[in-house]
Amino acid sequence: MTELKNDRYLRALLRQPVDVTPVWMMRQAGRYLPEYKATRAQAGDFMSLCKNAELACEVTLQPLRRYPLDAAILFSDILTVPDAMGLGLYFEAGEGPRFTSPVTCKADVDKLPIPDPEDELGYVMNAVRTIRRELKGEVPLIGFSGSPWTLATYMVEGGSSKAFTVIKKMMYADPQALHALLDKLAKSVTLYLNAQIKAGAQAVMIFDTWGGVLTGRDYQQFSLYYMHKIVDGLVRENDGRRVPVTLFTKGGGQWLEAMAETGCDALGLDWTTDIADARRRVGNKVALQGNMDPSMLYAPPARIEEEVATILAGFGHGEGHVFNLGHGIHQDVPPEHAGVFVEAVHRLSEQYHR
């Protein structure tokens, strides 16, 4: 494989010295960019864009042409795994993702296959290989998956949810069915991420978008336990380099200590967690990624820079910080403001790495 020209992101995740704090943005390939909208229109719809390796590669690279980002992230969706299990994913205008056959009971779970990542999810691996080739070693490529709990919420609710009553009903009334589903998902996600690593992903991230809707005890049993299983099953070395793993539970700031015990390399923080506090609690064990409120990108440039400076000062001197937003960039943010953000992170962080 090509020599990596900028490995700042991978080094920071392993808490090794870097010259400046690396930065990337969740959903950096997305609807805030006019060029993304044009490519998506060319593809026809969102899943067609995900399933076309050349177009998925094009949108992955678009933000890197605009901004000096320190990592590329595979353009895909967390719902590729349930889609490959045969749930019939489709997108309803204004409603987001839906499934034609949601999981309602243990019998439904028993019927679900564990997808072969090189077969049913082969289009994702093709995209990873294509992107790695086109990156030419400029920056590392991040692979990702949704967490078992987060994928299960969509599969049981039949799509997006606000109250999560359907899956919580299963959790409390039929926990066996939910554990069976989560176990199957943990196996599927482990295979899926390992296939991404084999195809060329140089780091992986597990997005637990909905872990924060659980009580502490339920989080341990129904979300963290299964993420821990995945971390245990991942290939951690490829191409002679360590493959760092980041766990991100949105709304999970109160559980950082437990998350750091899983053996992951880094934790993603949302914007509701104080980064100085997070570093005090777990900084001797894991790197931290985050954590500016994505809505801050609506602010004038000077205010964005001020917020970047505050977060950098909060983390302080030394290694183990990857700058990011606390969740995905919003679709109506001015692209220039994202540029201000990225440039400010590099310029203002230098003093913390001397």
From Swiss-Prot:
Binding residues annotated for substrate, in chain numbering: R27, Q28, A29, G30, R31, D77, Y154, T209, H327
Molecular functions (GO terms): uroporphyrinogen decarboxylase activity
Keywords (A to Z) from UniProt: Cytoplasm, Decarboxylase, Lyase, Porphyrin biosynthesis
Signal peptide region: none
EC number: 4.1.1.37
GO CC terms: cytosol
InterPro entries listed in its UniProt record: UROD/MetE-like_sf, Uroporphyrinogen_deCO2ase_HemE, Uroporphyrinogen_deCOase
Pfam families in the cross-refs: URO-D
Gene3D superfamilies xref list: 3.20.20.210
Identification of the protein by name: Uroporphyrinogen decarboxylase
